[in-house]
């Protein structure tokens, strides 16, 4: 059967695809691509002046692929995916097993779109995703686009085969003791851990997340999240919480939230979005307790994998040693701005190469370089 594409430039057109879009996100096990999340991001977080350029792929009347891009405002025409800069492991969607034909069709459609792309970015995409390279190979024209890689980051994951008890038994005795002690201490002080499910508690949880998160990062140079994250969470929660596609784990003490951790879920995959917690009660380990509860819950639901998101921070590595890296990559088609675009990407490329070289360098050499740098 032949495939056809449709370029979607108006929000109301995209909203009409919400049901098959959701089904596709579940089929692809891609929580970051859930429509309730990405539409809320578009309404509240997308840069002002952005243009919607989503490519839908149909087989007869069935949606078999969706690449929800937007044009980032600026002199250079950058095509980015909805959720870029906010959510990790975002990706276009395609019926499994048909990624190549669908991605190739999306690439050809974008090549003819207006405004013409100077750059197509895949930010925080799974490093194993075939989409960027298929774009390189399928983009029409005499010359292939140049593919760049701006950065690669570890992204810890936990396979949920077996049961929670089996996983916990495999962790170190020290980890088990610390978690049990933290739970007991919270209970002794009258605290609790639970999911926010009712509209009133959901609203309280999203507000508490924003308050706790931004307060924590205020003295550390600020958060990478937009200030509009509360509006994003509120909007998304109205669509996602009831179906279990958004989970707000709240650690409370004396009726006051100590931690709110936000997770997205689709197709057997749980993705950690972010959290906010009260550092003044760090002795109770509220962030670890919320993560522990979310993992136990994911096991109970029979899910396949738990994704901790980008960054191999120490608290994540207490739960797992598995890694599924994510990368910031993209393509630069041969347009009139090709050379200028490559030139502007050069600093990011240089930083990435230096980082790669540094990681491969013997540790003794790295220490010596740091000593020399400190003397200057």
Which positions does each model-derived feature cover?
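Short linear elements at protein peripheries
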Residues: 366-376
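Low-complexity, flexible helical/coil segments
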Residues: 41-43, 90-94, 102-105, 155-160, ...
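Active-site/acyl-donor-binding loops of N-acyltransferases
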Residues: 3-7, 11, 132-165, 303-363, ...
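A short, structure-level motif marking secondary-structure boundaries and short turns
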Residues: 167-168, 222, 279-281, 296-298, ...
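A conserved beta-strand-loop-helix scaffold within acyl/acetyltransferase catalytic domains
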Residues: 3-79, 125-151, 155, 159-283
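Acyl-donor binding region in acyl/amide transferases
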Residues: 51-52, 58-59, 71-151, 265-324, ...
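Short intrinsically disordered coil segments
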Residues: 107, 169-177, 343-349
């Amino acid at each position: 059967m032949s495939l056809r594409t449709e370029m979607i430039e108006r929000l109301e057109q995209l909203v009409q695809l919400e049901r098959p879009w959701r089904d596709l996100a579940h089929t692809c096990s891609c929580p970051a691509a859930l429509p309730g999340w990405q539409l809320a991001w578009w309404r509240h977080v997308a840069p002002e002046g952005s243009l919607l350029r989503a490519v839908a792929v149909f087989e007869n009347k069935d949606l078999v692929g969706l690449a929800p891009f937007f044009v980032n405002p600026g002199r250079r025409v950058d095509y980015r995916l909805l959720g870029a800069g906010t959510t990790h492991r975002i990706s276009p969607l395609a019926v499994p097993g048909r990624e190549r034909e669908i991605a190739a069709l999306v690439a050809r459609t974008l090549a003819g779109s207006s405004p013409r792309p100077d750059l197509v970015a895949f930010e925080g995409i799974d490093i194993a995703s075939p989409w960027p390279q298929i774009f390189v190979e399928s983009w029409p024209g005499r010359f292939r686009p140049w593919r760049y890689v701006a950065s690669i980051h570890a992204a810890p994951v936990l396979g949920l085969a077996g049961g929670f008890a089996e996983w916990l038994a495999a962790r170190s005795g020290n980890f088990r003791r610390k978690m049990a002690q933290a739970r007991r201490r919270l209970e002794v002080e009258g605290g609790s851990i639970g999911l926010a499910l009712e509209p009133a508690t959901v609203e309280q949880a999203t507000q508490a997340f924003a308050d706790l998160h931004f307060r924590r990062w205020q003295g550390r140079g600020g958060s990478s999240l937009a200030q509009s994250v509360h509006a994003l969470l509120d909007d998304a929660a109205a669509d996602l919480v009831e179906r279990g596609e958004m989970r707000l784990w709240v650690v409370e003490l004396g009726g006051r939230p100590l931690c709110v951790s936000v997770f997205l879920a689709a197709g057997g995959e749980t993705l950690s979005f972010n959290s906010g917690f009260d550092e003044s009660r760090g002795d109770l380990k509220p962030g670890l307790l919320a993560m522990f509860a979310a993992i136990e819950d994911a096991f109970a639901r029979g899910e396949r994998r738990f994704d901790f998101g980008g960054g191999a921070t120490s608290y994540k590595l207490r739960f797992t040693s598995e890694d599924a890296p994510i990368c910031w990559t993209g393509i630069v088609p041969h347009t009139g701005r090709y050379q200028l675009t490559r030139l502007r990407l050069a600093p990011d490329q240089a930083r990435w190469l230096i980082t790669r070289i540094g990681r491969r360098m013997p540790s003794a050499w790295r220490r010596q370089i740091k000593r020399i740098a400190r003397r200057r």
